[in-house]
Amino acid sequence: IPGIWENGTPYCHGGTFKVVADCLLGRGDKAYETITKILPDADSNPSDESGCEPYVVTNMYFGPDNPRKGETLFAWVTGTAGWMFRAITQYMLGFHPSYNSFTVNPCVPSDWKEVTMTRVFRGDTYKVTVKNESGAQSGVKKLTVDGNAVDGNEVEIFDDGKTHEIIVEM
């Protein structure tokens, strides 16, 4: 059927995988462009056409070749929201957890000069600030944790229940 599923549908769930791939390749501008197309109530998917609440990350919406163009299906039965959260926090903002540590490796649009995120992880609170005066899309020039320089981009988990400040310079 034209304009449904993989046959010409804007597939939001798959779009989140593209965001991750773009970030892994250092393409912050492309990653952000995709996010703006699949976010709820985006210009390409206005809620007054989709029949979906304007705050719901949907699985897909019918493409232009389908008689139901713009309508959405499976708004509440999809992993798209979880993958969107993961794509943004772990890959764009670069807070990627592992067992005893996390890496900080942001991939952001070149016109973002600064972005912040607060993340609670294993009982600790991390306030992450990404500074991008150079207009880079990826790469870490300098990383500090609680004012102390860190070699590389891996941070050991504190496990102390406190708040820690991370500053990333791209």
Q: Which ranges hold each PLM region?
A:
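Non-catalytic C-terminal accessory modules of carbohydrate-active enzymes
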Residues: 1-6, 10, 17-170
